[in-house]
């Protein structure tokens, strides 16, 4: 009996580590998906730096309680798979929602972001976000725009100053 308890404790620790080491986690109901469809989903998630693992509800509940995640118990019913985004939560969520459009048997249950349980519509909002690198580019562009404007204003003032000096030089040359 003891080896089984140790084995379950090991699985709980694996689930905890998956959640802790990820940017976000999403619980899905995969009931009705074929092995080929699950393999396709795994491949698509892997391309986006995410992975998916089928978990036992009781062990997932235990892992959630150990991590201090509350409000997850009602969603841990029926077949459950845990998808974790190691890099970009938006990309992983987008893959899941796109896959669910083509495969209605896949149902997104709930998400976990920084140990906070997110409803399906909140996870959908994350999926609708642009990828991380696009957001960073927009942020950087927004930060650089005022600097370019300031540099342009300084260059314009310097240009006017040079033109004024040139006009004074021509005026003095004309007086002599």
From Swiss-Prot:
<dbReference type="InterPro" id="IPR022973">
    <property type="entry name" value="Ribosomal_uL10_bac"/>
</dbReference>
<keyword id="KW-0699">rRNA-binding</keyword>
<dbReference type="GO" id="GO:0015934">
    <property type="term" value="C:large ribosomal subunit"/>
</dbReference>
<comment type="similarity">
    <text>Belongs to the universal ribosomal protein uL10 family.</text>
</comment>
<dbReference type="InterPro" id="IPR002363">
    <property type="entry name" value="Ribosomal_uL10_CS_bac"/>
</dbReference>
<keyword id="KW-0694">RNA-binding</keyword>
<dbReference type="Pfam" id="PF00466">
    <property type="entry name" value="Ribosomal_L10"/>
</dbReference>
<dbReference type="GO" id="GO:0006412">
    <property type="term" value="P:translation"/>
</dbReference>
<comment type="subunit">
    <text>Part of the ribosomal stalk of the 50S ribosomal subunit. The N-terminus interacts with L11 and the large rRNA to form the base of the stalk. The C-terminus forms an elongated spine to which L12 dimers bind in a sequential fashion forming a multimeric L10(L12)X complex.</text>
</comment>
<keyword id="KW-0687">Ribonucleoprotein</keyword>
<dbReference type="GO" id="GO:0070180">
    <property type="term" value="F:large ribosomal subunit rRNA binding"/>
</dbReference>
<dbReference type="InterPro" id="IPR043141">
    <property type="entry name" value="Ribosomal_uL10-like_sf"/>
</dbReference>
<dbReference type="InterPro" id="IPR047865">
    <property type="entry name" value="Ribosomal_uL10_bac_type"/>
</dbReference>
<dbReference type="InterPro" id="IPR001790">
    <property type="entry name" value="Ribosomal_uL10"/>
</dbReference>
<dbReference type="GO" id="GO:0003735">
    <property type="term" value="F:structural constituent of ribosome"/>
</dbReference>
<comment type="function">
    <text>Forms part of the ribosomal stalk, playing a central role in the interaction of the ribosome with GTP-bound translation factors.</text>
</comment>
<protein>
    <recommendedName>
        <fullName>Large ribosomal subunit protein uL10</fullName>
    </recommendedName>
</protein>
<keyword id="KW-0689">Ribosomal protein</keyword>
């Amino acid at each position: 009996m003891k080896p089984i308890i140790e084995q379950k404790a090991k699985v709980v620790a694996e689930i905890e580590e998956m959640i802790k080491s990820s940017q976000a986690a999403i619980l899905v109901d995969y009931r009705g998906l074929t092995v080929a469809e699950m393999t396709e989903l795994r491949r698509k998630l892997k391309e986006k730096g995410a992975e998916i693992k089928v978990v036992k509800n009781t062990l997932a509940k235990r892992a959630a309680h150990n991590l201090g995640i509350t409000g997850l118990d009602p969603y841990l019913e029926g077949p459950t798979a845990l998808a974790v985004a190691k890099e970009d939560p938006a990309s992983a969520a987008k893959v899941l929602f796109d896959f669910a459009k083509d495969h209605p048997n896949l149902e997104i249950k709930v998400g976990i972001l920084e140990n906070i349980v997110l409803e399906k519509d909140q996870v959908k909002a994350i999926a609708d976000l642009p990828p991380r690198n696009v957001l960073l580019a927009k942020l950087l562009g927004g930060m650089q725009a005022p600097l370019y404007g300031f540099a342009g204003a300084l260059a314009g003032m310097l240009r006017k100053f040079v033109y004024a000096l040139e006009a004074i030089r021509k005026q003095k040359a004309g007086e002599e």
